[in-house]
């Protein structure tokens, strides 16, 4: 499947761009309440195109030459509803029924939005849903905060006792291995419309592993546009795909800025929809961009290491070790299969996919080493 767009103002068309298919592999576990709503549907990965006033899509039902296939005429914003095309040898192949093109407007920039993320203070009345999302971080920052500031190693260790004192093991109490808390832009900071998500928060018992992803949305964005991309992902996940909230627990842009993803509190074990089969007892971190052939920035890689050092440290997990997870069902491990997984893994380790892209996947070894170093191991 390929897409090209026409830039607003210049009228110039982009080259044809491939979009990642089978995007629901990032979704909820098969038997979860989120998957059972009946709202979820198959989709491609979202593609960031910036300000555009025209779009064309072409779809190959099976392997063939894209130059021999006419673009699918979407007809309207709702897109086409499928059809037939000629495959190899002149055979007719049917396109999926109900195909449509969703155009996602990320909305206007939030006040103070810049390359450094949204800055305080934020004005305006908070809705009940916005208050609930913000209150989930009340142990870390005041209600309505747009960012959670970083802490020193000592401050983080003291906070760990405050957050999880009675749950800490004797070893954690004696010598807690946890990385300094990094700065995180909150949902209010990137301008989340809290009316789009389900009202309640869903938690898992603890966080034993982190799965690293890429959004496969392209790399043609500036860091000042990152909040817009995240608002787009959020709307796409909830309105187009029928998920309860954005799927990822955290997102990281190319400048190394970390953003809160799914609502429920950054220090809490929020259950995401990022690695089908392994959303329980894990957290999902998505680096914004496509990293199959392009290397991720050093700032982004460092941010993933800092984030995992802190988040995994809250639960006493060693980034350089392995842990046991039980599959809830997927295309790589059958439901109920116990799997030894690296504490910091790529999406492809839990599901048969190219995510997080070969170039980012190769960086995970250094992420593990740096995260362990940040934890003081």
Which residues are covered by each model-predicted region?
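Beta-sandwich interaction modules
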Residues: 5-73
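Short acidic-glycine loop/turn motifs at beta-strand connectors
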Residues: 8-9, 253-255
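Basic/polar, cationic surfaces and motifs that engage anionic cell-wall
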Residues: 79-215, 219, 254-269, 273, ...
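Short, conserved charged micro-motifs
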Residues: 221-223
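Short Gly/aromatic-enriched secondary-structure transition segments
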Residues: 225-233
């Amino acid at each position: 499947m390929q897409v090209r767009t026409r830039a607003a103002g210049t009228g110039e068309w982009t080259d044809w761009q491939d979009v990642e298919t089978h995007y629901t592999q990032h979704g909820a576990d098969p038997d979860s309440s989120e998957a059972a709503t009946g709202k979820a549907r198959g989709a491609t990965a979202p593609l960031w195109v910036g300000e555009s006033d025209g779009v064309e899509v072409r779809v190959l039902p099976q392997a063939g030459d894209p130059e021999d296939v006419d673009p699918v005429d979407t007809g309207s914003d709702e897109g086409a509803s499928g059809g037939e095309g000629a495959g190899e040898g002149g055979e007719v192949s049917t396109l999926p029924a109900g195909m449509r093109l969703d155009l996602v407007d990320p909305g206007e920039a939030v006040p103070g939005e810049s390359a450094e993320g949204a800055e305080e203070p934020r004005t305006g009345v908070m809705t009940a849903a916005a208050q609930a999302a913000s209150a989930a971080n009340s142990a870390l920052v005041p209600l309505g905060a747009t960012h959670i500031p970083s802490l020193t190693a000592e401050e983080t260790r003291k906070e760990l006792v405050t957050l999880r004192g009675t749950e800490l093991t004797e070893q954690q109490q004696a010598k807690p291995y946890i990385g300094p808390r990094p700065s995180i832009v909150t949902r209010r900071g990137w301008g989340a419309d809290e009316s789009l998500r389900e009202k309640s928060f869903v938690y898992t018992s603890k966080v034993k592993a982190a799965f690293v992803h890429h959004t496969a949305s392209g790399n043609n964005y500036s860091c000042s546009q990152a909040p817009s991309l995240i608002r787009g992902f959020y709307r796409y996940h909830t309105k187009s795909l029928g998920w309860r909230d954005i799927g990822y627990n955290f997102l990281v842009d190319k400048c190394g800025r970390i953003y809160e993803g799914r609502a429920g509190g950054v220090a809490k074990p929020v259950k995401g929809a990022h690695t089908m089969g392994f959303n329980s007892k894990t957290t999902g971190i998505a680096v914004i961009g496509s990293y199959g052939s392009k290397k991720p920035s050093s700032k982004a890689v460092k941010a993933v290491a800092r984030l995992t050092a802190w988040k995994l440290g809250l639960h006493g997990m060693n980034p350089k070790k392995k842990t046991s997870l039980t599959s809830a069902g997927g295309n790589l491990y059958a439901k109920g299969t116990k799997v030894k997984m690296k504490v910091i893994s790529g999406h492809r380790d839990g599901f048969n996919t190219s995510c997080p892209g070969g170039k980012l996947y190769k960086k995970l070894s250094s992420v593990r080493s740096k995260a362990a170093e940040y934890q003081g191991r």
